[in-house]
Amino acid sequence: MESYLNSNFDVKAKHSSEEVLEKWRNLCSVVKNPKRRFRFTANLSKRYEAAAMRRTNQEKLRIAVLVSKAAFQFISGVSPSDYKVPEEVKAAGFDICADELGSIVEGHDVKKLKFHGGVDGLSGKLKACPNAGLSTGEPEQLSKRQELFGINKFAESELRSFWVFVWEALQDMTLMILGVCAFVSLIVGIATEGWPQGSHDGLGIVASILLVVFVTATSDYRQSLQFRDLDKEKKKITVQVTRNGFRQKMSIYDLLPGDVVHLAIGDQVPADGLFLSGFSVVIDESSLTGESEPVMVTAQNPFLLSGTKVQDGSCKMLVTTVGMRTQWGKLMATLSEGGDDETPLQVKLNGVATIIGKIGLSFAIVTFAVLVQGMFMRKLSLGPHWWWSGDDALELLEYFAIAVTIVVVAVPEGLPLAVTLSLAFAMKKMMNDKALVRHLAACETMGSATTICSDKTGTLTTNHMTVVKSCICMNVQDVASKSSSLQSDIPEAALKLLLQLIFNNTGGEVVVNERGKTEILGTPTETAILELGLSLGGKFQEERQSNKVIKVEPFNSTKKRMGVVIELPEGGRIRAHTKGASEIVLAACDKVINSSGEVVPLDDESIKFLNVTIDEFANEALRTLCLAYMDIESGFSADEGIPEKGFTCIGIVGIKDPVRPGVRESVELCRRAGIMVRMVTGDNINTAKAIARECGILTDDGIAIEGPVFREKNQEEMLELIPKIQVMARSSPMDKHTLVKQLRTTFDEVVAVTGDGTNDAPALHEADIGLAMGIAGTEVAKEIADVIILDDNFSTIVTVAKWGRSVYINIQKFVQFQLTVNVVALIVNFSSACLTGSAPLTAVQLLWVNMIMDTLGALALATEPPNNELMKRMPVGRRGNFITNAMWRNILGQAVYQFIIIWILQAKGKSMFGLVGSDSTLVLNTLIFNCFVFCQVFNEVSSREMEEIDVFKGILDNYVFVVVIGATVFFQIIIIEFLGTFASTTPLTIVQWFFSIFVGFLGMPIAAGLKKIPV
């Protein structure tokens, strides 16, 4: 079976082609209810539609750019636009309508933009200020703005009501056939036996169908609500906005035309808009148009489209068009209907259901044929003249109903749906544990993870950074909480240079918030440096206003430094500042400021002193940054790059980023669970090693290597080196990508990778599970990731792994349980039909059994919470079989036991219990049915553990399991004792009840004994 499944029902956890997804669906030939079976599979037609939309967008944008360029050449000769403001827009106080705004940005219409007075003109017409943003003082004006220009939300499919799920559950082909059987049974029964005696069989089937439908619909409806809640969490995106004169964080769904949005590397453009100011802005439009070539956005080409990504630079943007008025809104509405890819387990279990369904269908046909043949043989024995009565018709109908119900029981439609149920349950619980699963498959894949490649900053450490040591002007000092002593020790000219560098060469900002308090905005590293500047007496706004910024090169993981070129107020001199990785920036310096504040050549002795200082700081687990400047003598153009060499070193700062509490224990837990943790960081190797030792990642037999050294290795050297690598420092994004790819392809590892920046995208994409940071992560990283770690904590990653293992094992438990029921129900009814000419389990009884094993069984077993024992096992890995030898052992062992018990009852039951009289067969069949159900109840308990003997451990922690077992027993008593007329049962004696329970219970020690058999 496994080889057939691997060749036909094997999909990747990520990036499966549409052809592969189509293939397995076409192989699912025995499907009772396609609407329900394929509800949680991707809608491929909607994906094709979205791809076509991207191609259309690409062509429209290409034409718009060409037209815009042509128009720009003749713009001075064109007469003013005859655009007229609609009356309702004018009455609301605005001078431009939403359609006109949309046509300007979407059409890249430079001509129209010019006619409306450029970006400043449009800002005025929208009653907004480029500096202060929107004013929302008047609620009426705000609601008018929303009414005229729309809100920044995309069209979503309506929440389906409970009755829709009831209707879908009724689409089950076998239930429909049984419904027809029930209807015919009612007609024939009433015609022959009268009302109400003749209606019992038919009404029994109808009641069973309705019960199955409502229980199924309730389960599906609850799942849909869980997925809806998770979907809302996925869409929570915030941006930095200036509104009412204050910079603040705001949900993208609250944005309105006229808002001023601040964008930086890794952000997603939240609406259509226009560039106000900024530097080196490069936009990736591939998500909208499919075009891979990045676009430079400047004052000359100011158009920013919703859904595109900031690849480089930073800027302020004026929002012009929102929501469904943008091309991104229309694309997202289509894509949301495309759905998630199916998970590998869902597809594999669809394969299992198909195989067993075909077997079950064959058994059902043969069973029906044998039962009908038996009936004909009885007729023949009565003589050549046949007489067909209403009872004969009812008997034939009952045979057909039994055959159909065998298909109901034999086609384990619940297998793939149990995966969805388990994943929905796990994802909901993981949200409480600060992990947001974006793709279903990631949850189950994480259970197989063998390696975690983790960032250092913010994941293993707290990301609360402070400068604790410095070496300014060759003078090493501890930085106290109040830096007055440091300030007095720095020469005045050097202090001025230092503050100029800190406040101009930064991606952060110091603002006054709505409460009138000073607030630092930016990354933790930027915040630490800005705090140092403020403590040294610097004033952010004064410094920024006194210099004119000419060029900014933001920090990225490849260069490992950032730079700025400014024009000084005195004499228009040009100065460049840079800061970044100490070794890299120091290598770009040829001069240094000494303790007297003089600029002197950087000789060997000074270089040695500074390198020793860097190593000392790093060995104390401090992140080190080197700060440097240079005066540019000749003229400098914004089109030029910032010089690479010739800088003067001002100093080095050591930033403390403490290790998170509990990380060492989590790393040790991973090691015991067979998961190798590797640190991949851009930091200095000594800093990385110190932190790695503190976390327990770097062991005596492990290797710490620098990225530049790693990338020089050939394939043969890598094969020997990679298994031992525990720390990679000074790594570039491509080093990370190479390591992940080698681990996956060469060493067959299942790799989870953390990332927070735009440059982590290749590694996140390549990994089996991409983990993005919720706090420090950029929108680009979050969008490409499979799981978002909301608290940026490594311990949460371990929790995700635990939940992943729990999902995988829970599904295995359910599959083991359901296949046991399938095998026994099939063989019992088939063999009984062949040997005795009758079936001991009726259609109504089989429907009840089907509900026990399908919906209720999935609820009980697929929602088991994880326990600590899960992290003491080795991971399944990439090549592990889903249906293991241990599972087959348990399935076949239990099936044989149950089959023997039922056959003993069929053969010797009447004599064992002294059953005589006309109702002896009914009592015996009721006893067989009762024993069969209790075998399933106790087997469900035994299935809680596939290898362990103690199946009661933690049973009370899973209240769903307890409720399901209790409800099953309760309704079984009701069916036997009170619903005999409809279920073809009769009340049992106390001895017969105890016997049924004992037979079921006896399956537990047998299950325990089976677990002792090695496989």
UniProtKB/Swiss-Prot annotation:
One of its GO terms (biological process) is pollen development. The modification Phosphoserine is found at residue 45. The chain crosses the membrane at residues 162-182, 201-221, 350-369, 400-417, 812-830, 842-862, 883-905, 918-939, 958-979, 990-1011. Activated by calmodulin. Residues 1-161, 222-349, 418-811, 863-882, 940-957, 1012-1015 are cytoplasmic. The modification N-acetylmethionine is found at residue 1. Belongs to the cation transport ATPase (P-type) (TC 3.A.3) family. Type IIB subfamily. The N-terminus contains an autoinhibitory calmodulin-binding domain, which binds calmodulin in a calcium-dependent fashion. This is Putative calcium-transporting ATPase 7, plasma membrane-type. It comes from Arabidopsis thaliana.
